[in-house]
Amino acid sequence: MNIETIKSVYFVGAGGIGMSALVRYFLSKGKVVAGYDRTPTPLTENLIAEGAQIHYEENVRLIPEACKDKESTLVVLTPAVPQEHEELVYFRNNGFEIQKRAQVLGTITHSSKGLCVAGTHGKTTTSTMTAHLFHQSHIECTAFLGGISKNYGTNLLLSQKSPYTVIEADEFDRSFHWLSPYMSVITATDPDHLDIYGTEKAYLESFEHYTTLIQPGGALIIRKGISLQPKVQAGVRVYTYSRDEGDFHAENIRIGNGEIFIDFVAPDTRINNIQLGVPVSINIENGVAAMALAHLNGVTDEEIRQGMNSFRGVDRRFDFKIKNDQVVFLSDYAHHPSEIKQSVLSIRELYEDKKITAIFQPHLYTRTRDFYQDFADSLSLLDEVILVDIYPARETPIPGVTSKLIYDNLRPGIEKSMCKKEEILNILKDKNIEVLITLGAGDIDNYVPEIKKELEKMKNEERRTKN
């Protein structure tokens, strides 16, 4: 099916962060766009406001007539939707063209110079940072992102003139094997998605295959020290990067007073005195990778310096909601033990003298089963942990796998509690909160506005009591 000539696109799972970028793309092309999602969210409401027709009931009768012609309709599927989904069964039984999100993304971006960011963690911030560096430069870019850019309020950037497309390359379900990168960063290969891959070896082999897809004339920029043997084609340059060493790295790092300055070192240049727009130490390494992609493709030194300073971050990625002398509250998407450890260490660096509390919602039964001890070790770096029930996403429960597995393995002496999501506000009322972070990739973020209100109310009452 020719994507240019189709008239309508139907999304089964329209509200996912990756799917919604494609929804926006097809709306920009003037297609009729409709779809199903499980629950309303601010993102699905935004998509409706932008012209998409989205419903929240698994019901074939709610599919618009414009999306019932198999000759002119493309159906896009997210792996999170079960195969027995009523609408998916309807499309399958009636001979519609059904493609995975990654397959569609690969087709759309095949004719452009794909700048892809892959890896277990860090890819959303790094790809969004890369997109910003290009978009604000003389080169520009199109971008399909895995998070909402705070600079642009969207996960889709469009350019009519740029040959470059920045893509977050997702390893789940081997999705990134549909891509044809011109250049790629690989940030990390810590094992994940073992429900799909089975073993760490298979997970690494998937990344090895991904490196074979990079086009001759392009480049691989791989984090120094990760356990991966790239298998690039002839004519593909291979570079290393990290915070402190590699072909691309940072030097003269200055952290203090809520600010971070670095010098960026490349094989053929040095850009001094770069100020990070989102001053958390984890963004030094993310920034090095983004600047490497920008530098290799002609973004000027001054454009890189200005872009790093004007970068405002990504929703749910070290996303500050309250930041004052009384209380700090932020939301973070970290859902893998390594990500949580990095996030906690970054917070500890910023607020070393304060009590740090986290509300953690584990994501997936399989991930909890496979990594509960690692989760407990990472969370034990905190002063206090509040655990809520596992967010199942696409999975059914596994007997014996609950948040209590993590709870029981937290370090002795840590303040800890367990509750249902609906009980979070009541739990917080009895606590002395100095720095609070919500962690997880599930729906914990839906509670962030209420948590913010409750914290502001608590601190106002404290002030009144003191006065």
Spans of features found by a protein language model:
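Short internal beta-strands
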Residues: K31-R38, L220-K224, T357-F360, L382-P392
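C-terminal helical cap/extension that packs against the catalytic core
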Residues: E50, R237, A376-E434
